[in-house]
Amino acid sequence: MFIMKKYIICMILLVLLGGFTFFEENNNKSFNIDDLYDYQKEFKTEEIDVCARAGAKTYMDYRMTTVVSSRQYQFIHNELTVDKNTGFLYDKDGFIAVALGSFYGEIGDRFYFTLDTGIVLPLVKAEEKADQDTDAMGCYHLIDTSIIEFVIDDYYAGNYFWNNGNGLVLNGNYNNYSLFKGDIEKVEKVLEERNDKYVTYTYNYDIPKDIDIFNYASGY
C-alpha cells in the first residue's frame, strides 16, 4: 500500500513539474492531419466577424504556459492531447489548439476558420494573446500580424515539419506549409449541437507524399 501511494505521488509530481500531457485515452477521436484536406463539419455554427484576413500563422510551445492555476494551463493539461506525429494539441473532437486574441471568445471556445483555399481549420482556443501585444480590437499580433497561433509540442512538430536548421518550425510560420497557406476567409463559432448531416469540404490538392518545403525568405 505504501509503495502504491508513493507511486501515485510521484506521478502527480511529474505532471505538475514536467509540464507534459498524457491523457490520450480520455479523448474520443484520434488526430490525422490528412483529414483536413477533406474536412467534415460535425457541429452547428454561427458565423461571426473576420477581424482581419492575415495569412501568417505562428506557434508557441504549450510548455510556455506555466501558471498552474490559470484557466489556459488547466485546459491544456486536462482537455487536450499531444499528437506525437505532428506536435499539434487537439481536443476530444479533433479541434486543434491555438492562441487567439480577446476578439475571439474565451478559453475553450471552438471555431471553424475557413481559408481562401477552401481549407476548413477546426480550432479550439487554448491560450489568449495578451492585449498589449495585439491591435486595439484584440485581433492580430502587432509584430507578425498573426491571428492564428498554434499551440504545439515543438519537439514533435520539429521532427514532422522542416525547420531549416534554425530551430524554428516552418521558419516560425505555418503559412509556409501548403495545407495551412492562405488568408482567413470566414470564421464560425461552433455550437454544442451536432449537425444532423455532416457538411463536407474538399480541397482539390494532391496530398504530397513527402513534406513540402517552402522557403519564404523572412518566413512570412
For the regions a language model picked out, list residue spans one by one.
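Gram-positive cell-envelope targeting signals
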Residues: 1-36
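Solvent-exposed, well-ordered loop and adjacent helix/strand elements within mature globular domains
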Residues: 28-220
